[in-house]
Amino acid sequence: MRCEVPLPLLGLLLCVVGAAAQGGQEEFAVEISGTTVTITCPSSGDDVKWKPDPKMVVNNKYIIQNHDSSPLTVSCTAGDEEHTMYLNAKVCANCEELDTFTVVGIIAADLLITLGVLILVYYFSKNKKGQSRAAAGSRPRAQKMRRPPPVPNPDYEPIRKGQRDVYAGLEHRGF
């Protein structure tokens, strides 16, 4: 019972300290367009050195053309500061990025169209219930004719009223 109050307080303290520790770190800027990945170093300056391949640098930005979606560790050094990033970007040539508003709009439009079709089907089927027209080439139907009962199968012998055999009738037997 004594640990109920300190545990939430300890959790809050850990969140505040963790956020303060992460707040000082600068982040890489990553842009993905088709199969091209452009990475900008968080350190500003003209003497930024990139690893693993310093040849892929244009205007202090590390540009990977035709990236094959394989994981890659990229690091940049500006002066005495070194920043390292693990890049695991999935890229494709014909991909399009959709924002949340577009996806929600597509789903809402689909639901509205479906609801409209349901309402149309309901109203059109409601009006057709009582209407029944005879087709052009059909003849009027007569009342259902009664058929005679089917002929009994000659393979089975009918049960006679006076017969008292074991299988002559249905009897209740207790097991």
UniProtKB/Swiss-Prot annotation:
Q: Where is this region: Disordered?
A: 133-163
Q: Where is the ITAM domain?
A: 146-173
Membrane topology summary: Single-pass type I membrane protein
- Which residue stretches are annotated as topological domain Cytoplasmic? 122-175
Extract one GO cellular component term from the record.
Answer: external side of plasma membrane
Cite the GO molecular-function annotations of the record: transmembrane signaling receptor activity
Q: Where in the cell is it found?
A: Cell membrane
One GO biological process this protein is involved in is:
cell surface receptor signaling pathway
TM region(s), chain numbering:
101-121
Question: Taking the first listed entry, what is the main subcellular location of this protein, grouped into a coarse class?
Answer: membrane
Matching entries from Pfam families are given as:
Ig_5 (PF16681)
Cite the entry's keywords alphabetically.
Cell membrane, Immunity, Immunoglobulin domain, Membrane, Receptor, Signal, Transmembrane, Transmembrane helix
Identify the stretch annotated as signal peptide in this record.
1-21
Recorded hits in InterPro entries, A to Z, give:
CD3_esu/gsu/dsu, Ig-like_fold, Phos_immunorcpt_sig_ITAM
Segments on the Extracellular face: 22-100
| Function recorded in the entry | The CD3 complex mediates signal transduction, resulting in T-cell activation and proliferation. Required for normal immune responses.
How is the subunit organization of this protein annotated in UniProt? The TCR/CD3 complex of T-lymphocytes consists of either a TCR alpha/beta or TCR gamma/delta heterodimer coexpressed at the cell surface with the invariant subunits of CD3 labeled gamma, delta, epsilon, zeta, and eta.
Name of the featured protein: T-cell surface glycoprotein CD3 epsilon chain
Source organism (scientific name):
Gallus gallus (Chicken)
